[in-house]
């Protein structure tokens, strides 16, 4: 179905009668628009009148992490832009669930070392972790990703490679590859003897995460195919006895399609007819280009491990011609990091997934992080204090878009973040500052009535009717506080006044508290308390509370820091804590007065 969409960064242009109005790009474009231009043009050249096909590939070999999400978000954003312009488009996600189980990921609940017995089997033949509701390993990890993609508004057609191979969908392609195995071997041979180019001086050395990612991808050398005494074969059977792929093809007859293989794991051997045998797959460097041709893929990005010289994307660009297809437009995408952690690799457990991120941030923010950076730019997703700064940046952008002051590229990224061609994603009705919500959740410790009271005090002229108005953002901030803030950084309000500290205060310290206490009632709102706590040191120094930094000597900043530290010590027994206006609101006026010695 053709769709039209109106977006702030687009111009609508009426075409001739009976032609739908579609969204047209403005001259100022972002990376998504530029790829969409290229993809539409290429699709019309290759397959005029047919839906544009973009693709992603995900291997459910373990938790599917936030780096893998870039494999999906890059084509999703391009597909969505194509759809906004009124074109039909399919976003395929190939679940590589017929891949071999390579290793047991660490730190996966319900999994122990006994899972190593299944190494070499298809992922769909490996048991799911203990306690899982899913029938096998692949379905267990696929399910979590499907749920996250739904929350992110990603529309796709999923293809199980287990289903494709075991039902014989690719039979003709397999027979064709076997018939042309000499041509495939010759292409692969061009790269087997080449050494990787020396890394440039300014490049960082490959870290363990990158090596792990390469090992878990089609860049691994073993995905080249076997070349034993009987020659090269681009096809690998799974053993009929142990189900593993420790097999070697020992003979093949093109006319009869009789194939004999032996398993080095269990010693089993058999002869089958490949024109009716469905328990095996093409090796990765042949499988991928075969699928490009079979599905007519126009756009599919790949990670740096697939894009290096001699790796699967480069080699596939030559092999795809054997299947009568063309290589897709395929930008390389960079690694995605986590604040405070090394680059991610899904062959390790314990690495944050999209589901983990969506517990602490709204889908709009996560979409924005992927939309605002070109695929070849690396970026980090924050699970530490940095998330508060990211949310501040997002809220500022939101305000600029609303008042028309945002730059066109930023407007485009914002539009892609808040919705798709099908409409806007559900959003928080009253998006209060994330850092404020986090502080309130921290201090109230799950008491929703107390949280509502404090949040209503933020703006007494427009109080919250219920906590639902601040959801789901409030729930995300609460989850971040509860799961990602170390215990020693949590805020615990003092139960009793610090009598010793209060007694030790000099006249200036006592006067600062008096000025604050005298102004509490009249300034009991977020803005009012902000003005008050910054104003007390100004007034003490003989300036107006409204004086700007330019009108003040540098020592006022020092006095403010000392005053803030005093308040933190009296309220929470530490040098620092949540922003003071939020903390004061959270503690409540009566308790603040008691803790400050009134």
List each model region and its residues.
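Active-site cores that bind ATP or allylic diphosphates and position pyrophosphate for catalysis
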Residues: 6-10, 154-354
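Charged, often glycine-rich, active-site loop that binds/positions anionic groups
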Residues: 98-116, 173-174, 342-349
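N-terminal catalytic cores of NTP/NDP-binding nucleotidyl/phosphoryl-transfer enzymes
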Residues: 20-109, 289-308
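Basic, alpha-helical terminal appendages of large translation-related enzymes
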Residues: 2-51, 63-64, 90-92, 202-203, ...
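The substrate-binding groove and active-site-proximal loops of carbohydrate-active enzymes
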Residues: 62-69, 124-135, 160-162, 166, ...
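A structural motif corresponding to the C-terminal end of an alpha-helix
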Residues: 85-87, 144-157
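Catalytic adenosine-cofactor/nucleotide-binding cores of aminoacyl-tRNA synthetases and other
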Residues: 308, 313, 323, 334-486, ...
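A glycine-rich helix N-cap at a beta->alpha junction
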Residues: 113-134, 148, 152
């Amino acid at each position: 179905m053709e769709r039209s969409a109106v977006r702030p960064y687009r111009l609508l242009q009426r075409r001739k009668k009976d032609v739908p109005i579609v969204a047209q790009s403005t001259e100022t474009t972002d990376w998504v628009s530029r790829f969409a231009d290229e993809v539409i043009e290429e699709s019309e050249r290759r397959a005029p009148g047919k839906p544009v096909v973009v693709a992603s590939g995900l291997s459910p070999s373990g938790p599917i992490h936030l780096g893998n999400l870039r494999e999906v978000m890059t084509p999703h954003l391009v597909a969505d832009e194509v759809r906004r312009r009124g074109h039909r488009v399919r976003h395929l996600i190939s679940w590589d669930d017929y891949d071999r189980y390579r290793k047991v990921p660490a730190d996966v609940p319900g999994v122990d070392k006994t899972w190593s017995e299944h190494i070499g089997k298809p992922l769909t033949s490996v048991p799911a972790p203990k306690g899982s509701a899913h029938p096998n390993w692949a379905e267990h990890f696929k399910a979590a990703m499907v749920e996250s993609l739904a929350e992110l508004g990603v529309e796709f057609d999923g293809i199980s490679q287990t289903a494709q191979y075991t039902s014989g969908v690719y039979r003709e392609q397999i027979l064709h590859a076997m018939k042309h195995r000499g041509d495939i071997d010759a292409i692969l041979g061009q790269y087997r003897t080449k050494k990787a180019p020396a890394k440039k001086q300014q490049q960082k050395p490959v870290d363990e995460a990158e090596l792990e990612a390469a090992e878990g991808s089609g860049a691994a050398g073993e995905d080249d195919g076997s070349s034993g005494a009987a020659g090269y074969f681009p096809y690998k059977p799974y053993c009929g006895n142990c189900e593993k792929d420790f097999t070697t093809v020992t003979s093949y007859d093109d006319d009869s399609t009789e194939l004999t293989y032996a398993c080095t794991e269990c010693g089993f051997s058999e002869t089958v007819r490949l024109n009716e045998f469905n328990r095996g797959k093409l090796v990765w460097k042949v499988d991928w280009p075969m699928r490009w041709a079979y599905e007519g893929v126009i756009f599919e990005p790949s990670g740096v491990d697939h894009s290096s010289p001699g790796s699967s994307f480069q080699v596939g660009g030559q092999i795809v011609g054997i299947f009568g297809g063309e290589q897709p437009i395929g930008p390389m995408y960079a690694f995605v990091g986590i604040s405070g952690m090394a680059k991610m690799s899904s062959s390790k457990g314990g690495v944050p997934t999209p589901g983990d991120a969506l517990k602490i941030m709204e889908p709009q923010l996560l979409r924005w992080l992927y939309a605002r950076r070109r695929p070849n730019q690396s970026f980090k997703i924050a699970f530490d204090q940095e998330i508060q700064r990211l949310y501040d940046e997002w809220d500022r952008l939101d305000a600029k878009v609303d008042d028309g002051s945002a730059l066109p590229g930023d407007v485009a990224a914002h539009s892609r973040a808040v919705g798709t061609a099908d409409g806007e994603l559900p959003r928080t009705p009253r998006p209060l500052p994330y850092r404020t919500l986090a502080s309130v959740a921290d201090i109230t410790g799950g008491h929703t009535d107390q949280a509502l009271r404090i949040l209503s005090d933020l703006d007494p002229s427009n109080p919250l009717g219920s906590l639902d108005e601040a959801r789901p953002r409030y729930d995300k901030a609460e989850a971040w506080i509860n799961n990602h803030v170390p215990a020693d950084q949590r805020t615990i309000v003092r139960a009793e006044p610090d009598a010793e500290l209060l007694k030790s205060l000099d006249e200036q310290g006592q006067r600062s508290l008096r000025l604050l206490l005298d102004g509490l009632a009249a300034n009991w709102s977020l803005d009012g308390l902000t003005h008050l706590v910054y104003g007390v040191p100004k007034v003490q120094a003989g300036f107006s509370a409204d004086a700007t930094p330019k009108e003040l000597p540098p020592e006022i900043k020092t006095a403010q820091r000392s005053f803030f530290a005093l308040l933190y010590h009296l309220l929470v027994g530490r040098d620092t804590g949540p922003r003071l206006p939020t903390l004061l609101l959270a503690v409540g006026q009566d308790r603040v007065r008691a803790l400050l010695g009134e």
